[in-house]
């Protein structure tokens, strides 16, 4: 049996700032606010005969691209049953409980998730990471999303 290694990538630079609001119900949501989100990863792979399991640099670069692509945007969910989003003249019109908020389309990301939470972001960003990075001989890839010190969620992929 080959030896397994678990790599942890938790770099200070893997952060992005974004605005959002969480939707709690048909009539309740948070006020618009922002977070300095952090991304980190846990990678499990078999060690090769050279004592090497996975290239940190591949995953560090991929995590940085995810951060860069989401930095300084308003994040809106496109699949919420309680938020209707329409596009009109360079703006997203986000209607919740009878109130419409306007966001410039070039400063807003419409994400394929039901709510902008660390849980939903973890799954969404893990899928993007898996599309971009070569999974190679990885056995597990877990992506962590934090929205502040001491609070985070993760999503995990395991090889079949």
Per-region residue spans from a language model:
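Charge-rich, low-complexity N-terminal segments
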Residues: 1-160
């Amino acid at each position: 049996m080959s030896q397994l290694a678990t790599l942890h990538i938790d770099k200070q630079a893997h952060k992005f700032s974004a605005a959002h609001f969480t939707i709690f119900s048909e009539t309740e949501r948070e006020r618009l606010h922002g977070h300095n989100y952090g991304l980190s990863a846990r990678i499990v792979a078999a060690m090769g005969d050279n004592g090497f399991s996975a290239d940190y640099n591949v995953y560090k670069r991929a995590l940085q691209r995810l951060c860069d692509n989401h930095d300084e945007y308003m994040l809106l969910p496109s699949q919420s049953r309680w938020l209707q989003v329409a596009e009109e003249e360079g703006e997203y019109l986000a209607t919740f409980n009878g109130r419409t908020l306007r966001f410039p389309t070039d400063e807003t990301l419409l994400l394929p998730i039901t709510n902008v939470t660390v849980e939903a972001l973890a799954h969404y960003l893990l899928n993007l990471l898996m599309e971009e990075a070569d999974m190679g001989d990885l056995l597990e890839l877990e992506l962590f999303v934090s929205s502040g010190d001491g609070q985070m969620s993760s999503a995990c992929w395991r090889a079949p």
